[in-house]
Regions:
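Conserved catalytic core of nucleotide-sugar-dependent glycosyltransferases
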Residues: 101-179
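A conserved acidic beta->alpha catalytic loop
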Residues: 35-47, 51, 64-66, 100
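Active-site beta-to-alpha loop of glycosyltransferases that engages the nucleotide-sugar donor
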Residues: 7-21, 38, 69
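C-terminal catalytic/acceptor-binding lobe
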Residues: 155-157, 161-166, 171-256
Length: 263
């Protein structure tokens, strides 16, 4: 059972070599397909130099052009990856961002053996204290965002609404499910669930997302970029209690100023 790995990459020169080292060590990769978006640094040069010596099959494509602000995220890339997958013979697809670090060598095997339609490990921010979950905008459970400092902590794989950043899908789930903006990962999961497929998260498996703040890079909600009202979805904690959007700023202060997780 082979796995196609899809990687969107842009402005990643400063940390790309670290990611590529982890990718090389990951077992079960049959082919790695990169979609490169125009970058002012030497991301493309770094990627091409690595590809010449890489111990796996590597393909590099130019990112599809942006047609409008609403298409500014990576849905067009996913659509092209779906076509590449259809033309190949891989049984599974792994989507992973190029700023994911500390990837277990056996990640693909660990995800694949669970035989789920769509499944993801937990994604944490590298070196962040207190321990911080990376992307609650796409990781959702019971209609709520994962709490960043106290996400659901079930002891085994559990069914969720959506996942992102790093996830695996079977060939059928990936190629036969519509993907769209503004949150491609989330819309993919929602569309998959609408077709009767199931989406899962495994808290026993972890990868770490680069802490981009030291590089001066900050996540900006897509709603802000698109001029839409903010997403006021609340957060769910490990004990299933809910934290509303108005309470979260105080919890961020407790975490990052005082180093404690609010109860």
């Amino acid at each position: 059972m082979s796995t196609l790995v899809g990687v969107p990459v842009k402005n990643a020169e400063m940390w790309l070599k670290r990611f590529l080292e982890y990718l090389e060590q990951m077992k079960g990769v049959s082919r790695a397909v990169f979609y490169y978006a125009l970058s002012p640094d030497e991301t493309l040069k770094t990627l091409k130099e690595w590809a010449e010596e890489a111990p796996l099959t590597v393909e590099i494509y130019k990112d599809p052009p942006m047609q409008s602000v609403s298409s500014a995220t990576i849905a067009p890339v996913y659509k092209e990856l779906q076509e590449i997958m259809r033309e190949g013979d891989e049984t599974h697809f792994l989507s992973i961002d190029a700023d994911i670090m500390k990837i277990p060598k056996t990640l693909i095997r660990s995800l694949k053996k669970q035989k789920k339609d769509v499944i993801a490990p937990y994604v944490w921010i590298e070196g962040q204290k207190p321990r911080t979950f990376y992307d609650p905008d796409v990781f959702r459970y019971k209609g709520l965002r994962f709490h960043q400092f106290d996400p659901p902590k079930l002891e085994t794989t559990f069914e969720v609404d959506s996942v992102g950043t790093c996830w695996m899908a079977t060939r059928e789930a990936f190629t036969e499910t519509e993907i769209d903006n503004p949150y491609p990962d989330r819309t993919f999961c929602n569309n998959a669930r609408a077709k009767g497929l199931k989406v899962w998260a495994d808290p026993r498996l972890s990868v770490y997302h680069l802490n981009t703040k030291p590089f001066g890079l900050h996540q900006i909600p897509l709603e802000a970029l698109l001029g839409k009202p903010p997403d006021n979805t609340a957060y769910i904690r490990s004990d299933d209690t809910v934290v509303d959007i108005g309470t979260m700023p105080g919890q961020y202060i407790d975490a990052f100023v005082w180093g404690r997780v609010s109860k």
